[in-house]
Regions:
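Anionic-ligand binding patches
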Residues: 2-4, 10-30, 34-192
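Alpha-helical hinge/cap motifs
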Residues: 8-9, 200
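Conserved small/polar residues in nucleotide/adenosyl-binding loops
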Residues: 193-200
Length: 200
């Protein structure tokens, strides 16, 4: 079974493809499938709702089984922000640096023990009109005082986990512990049984 990945984010697409390949999940981008998905309005109030919106749009546009990810960073000192607005936290066209710089400014002066945060990845996989799989992955960590590392994307340079920022990890190291890696391995397990799995 071949899946279409429902994203227009080139960096996220690269990471999804990198994680899916060794899991044995055959997935292609919209470009590879010769399809223009356009911009999908993410009107959900949760990661899961937005993942479904994106997967459903791709499924309806192509007729192919579709996989979509909606993810973001939730900072406890900011009452869970930026959350579902992580990608648009500093405006639609803001750079990654502008987004994480704004976040660092907002928690300036917050002590280390209160800089806890977590990344969430909600994956929706639509197999047919009547069958879908929804799974979540969560990775806990802390927000650093300064950005560190040159890898990854998004908020990776300021998210510390196990003593290093996500941006300091190799791709292989990050995939083993990241929210997205966790969620996609859950998806793989569900697909092996070819039946929807309850969210846990």
């Amino acid at each position: 079974m071949k899946f279409i990945i429902a994203t227009n984010n080139a960096k996220k697409l690269k990471e999804l493809e990198r994680i899916l390949k060794p899991l044995g999940i055959d997935a292609v981008s919209a470009k590879e499938a010769g399809v223009n998905l356009g911009e999908v309005e993410e009107t959900g109030t949760t990661f899961a709702e937005n993942a479904f919106i994106k997967a459903n749009a791709a499924f309806k546009a192509t007729g192919m089984p579709a996989i979509a990810d909606d993810s973001g960073l939730s900072v406890d000192a900011l009452d869970g922000r930026p959350g579902v607005y992580s990608a648009r936290y500093c405006g639609e066209n803001a750079t990654d640096e502008e987004k994480y710089t704004k976040l660092l400014e907002e928690i300036q002066g917050v002590p280390d023990e209160k800089r806890t945060a977590h990344f969430t990845s909600s994956i929706c996989c639509i197999l047919s009109d009547k069958e879908k799989i929804e799974v979540d992955g969560i990775c806990n960590g802390t927000i650093s005082h300064t950005p560190n590392g040159n890898g990854g994307f998004g908020y990776d340079p300021i998210f510390d986990c196990n003593g290093k920022s996500f941006a300091e990890l190799t791709a292989e190291e990050k995939d083993k512990i990241s929210h997205r890696g966790i969620a996609l391995r859950k998806l793989q397990a569900c697909l092996l049984y070819t039946s929807p799995s309850p969210r846990d």
